[in-house]
Amino acid sequence: MNIQDMILTLQKHWSNEGCVLMQSYDVEKGAGTMSPYTFLRSIGPEPWRVAYVEPSRRPADGRYGENPNRLYQHHQFQVIIKPSPDNIQELYLDSLRALGIDPLEHDIRFVEDNWENPSLGCAGLGWEVWLDGMEITQFTYFQQVGGIECKPVSVEITYGIERLASYIQDKENVFDLEWTSGFTVKDLFMMAEYEHSVYTFETSDVDMLFHLFSTYEKEAIRQMDNGLVHPAYDYVLKCSHTFNLLDAKGAISVTERTGYIGRVRNLARKVAKTYYEEREKLGFPMLKEEGSSHE
């Protein structure tokens, strides 16, 4: 099964479970969790079901396209369900069956791996899912997002698309993976992998990036003061990505690193608080929609 068919299969499976199929969010981010479809929608009491593919940029993992398992940008298939259903593990195993992986014929283990994202003030209880000894999915029950306690708890399922495809296609080099008929990962992404690695490690302007971080930080605060959650959060994401570029370049010392992470976290917490307050002013409208849909 090629990657395109994998994505279509997962989309169909989770759509059948009531998930909204969203498109990837158009601001750079290091993980699918950072999308507003997860970060913001996990806050507050309103129900939410979503599934989407998220390109995830990790500048420090760039290897000029020369490493068979490390990528500047990889892809995640992200599922969020709030509140978490009691049968979520079985729904997940059903998704593996849809991909042609029979749990009865493979060693599938849920290995405890509690998760946190310090820069966003997020934490949860969770597991890595191992398929015949290889991690393919992260399974997390959110306890806190943006410093706000999650009530009710959301469950997040994050499939590593290239990792899972490597298993399904039995390929050792990620660039040899078939994306769709006639196109490999190498065909689609090798040039970008090389160029982003050159930029990250060689040609990026450190002074400019420091300036951008401060500019984005100020604009995030200014838009929160205006009560504009989504524009503010876009600038939080830009701060995070800019920090990752500086960190990958080695421009931030160990002692400075903690301070920069704290600055991003403070912004994320303010956005989370503002989002909750704005939804509360609206009377948490999706609660009413959920109630009416069951009448």
Swiss-Prot record:
GO terms for cellular component: cytosol. The keyword Manganese does not apply. It is found in: Cytoplasm. Keywords: Aminoacyl-tRNA synthetase, ATP-binding, Cytoplasm, Ligase, Nucleotide-binding, Protein biosynthesis. InterPro entries: aa-tRNA-synth_II/BPL/LPL (IPR045864), Gly-tRNA-synth_heterodimer (IPR006194), Gly-tRNA_ligase_asu (IPR002310). Its EC number is 6.1.1.14. It is an enzyme of class 6 (ligase). It catalyses: tRNA(Gly) + glycine + ATP = glycyl-tRNA(Gly) + AMP + diphosphate. One of its GO terms (molecular function) is ATP binding. One of its GO terms (biological process) is glycyl-tRNA aminoacylation. PANTHER family: GLYCINE--TRNA LIGASE, CHLOROPLASTIC_MITOCHONDRIAL 2, GLYCYL-TRNA SYNTHETASE. Tetramer of two alpha and two beta subunits. Belongs to the class-II aminoacyl-tRNA synthetase family. This is Glycine--tRNA ligase alpha subunit. It comes from Bacillus velezensis (strain DSM 23117 / BGSC 10A6 / LMG 26770 / FZB42). The gene is glyQ.
